[in-house]
Swiss-Prot record:
The keyword Aminoacyl-tRNA synthetase does not apply. It is a multi-pass membrane protein. The chain crosses the membrane at residues 21-41, 94-114, 139-159, 164-184, 205-225, 240-260. This is Uncharacterized protein MJ0096. Keywords: Cell membrane, Membrane, Transmembrane, Transmembrane helix. It is found in: Cell membrane. One of its GO terms (cellular component) is plasma membrane.
Length: 262
């Protein structure tokens, strides 16, 4: 099983960057839905068993996520002003999520760097081979962990499946941002300590980081709009799909009219 998984991972590493990003993008969505579903199942199990073994961790995860967002939001509001709620929320989202992207890149790259240092200190061939096997294994585990992102399942555990419509517009760009960040991290690790023979220039890495930021930026600008539409639809009993279709149609028409005016 482990050998087969490593073979698949090596094939993934051998792919070109666009294919890697596309595969990682769909894996991020699959990981999100998986962790969300597991969270919902555990919450259901918790209610049957009259236990807090999932609701309490979910509350903790939500409080950690909220505290992180509030810390960023406070810093942003001091710059843009607390009266501009939309911009404060959007910029807080952008900064918070792009920080997450940078952490993903750093974590994957750092793993390769640390194992490279250990390999340089290794004295025997057997020791080097064992270290390299461990490096490949833990890089795969870290890759899977970043893609599945189990914390998401706990944070969103109180949402219904039908509520996920609210995630789709900004999530489309957000997961492209995260997928690009994961690919950057994987490329960095393979550049530092190669598993497969691939060449990537520093310029390409910088471009990919910029692309990740652009995707997160677009998602950040859409996210407050998505949750406003969601809250409005819930408050007035409007079907979510109809609310989002109408909301984005009007937004699109407004932007088109603004372009023609300019």
């Amino acid at each position: 099983m482990e050998v087969k998984a490593m073979e698949i991972f090596k094939k993934y590493l051998s792919l070109n960057i666009p294919k890697k990003i596309l595969i990682t993008y769909f894996l991020c969505w699959a990981g999100f839905l998986f962790s969300f579903s597991v969270g919902k199942f555990l919450l259901y199990l918790s209610s049957i068993l009259k236990s807090n073994f999932i609701s309490e961790p979910a509350k903790l995860a939500q409080s950690v996520g909220t505290a992180k967002f509030n810390a960023v939001s406070s810093a942003v509001s001091n710059t843009v002003g607390v009266k501009n709620a939309y911009l404060t929320y959007a910029l807080s989202y952008i900064v918070s999520n792009f920080m997450g992207c940078l952490i993903i890149m750093f974590a994957l790259g750092a793993l390769a760097y640390l194992y490279k240092k250990d390999l340089e200190k290794a004295k025997t061939l057997e020791e080097k081979e064992e270290l390299f096997k461990c490096y490949q294994k833990y890089l795969l585990i870290l890759f899977i962990f970043t893609v599945i992102n189990p914390l998401t399942g706990l944070i969103g555990v109180n949402l219904q499946y039908s509520d996920l419509i609210a995630v789709l517009p900004h999530g489309f760009f957000e997961f492209f941002g995260f997928a690009t960040a994961v690919v950057v991290g994987v490329e960095l690790s393979n550049k530092i300590l190669p598993i497969v023979k691939r060449e990537i220039t520093s310029k390409k890495i910088v471009i990919l980081i910029a692309c990740s930021f652009i995707f997160i930026f677009i998602a950040g600008m859409l996210e407050p709009i998505d949750w406003f539409i969601y809250s409005y639809a819930k408050a007035y009993g409007i079907p979510l799909l109809a609310a989002f279709a109408t909301g984005y149609k009007n937004l699109f028409l407004y932007l088109i009219s603004m372009l023609f005016k300019s």
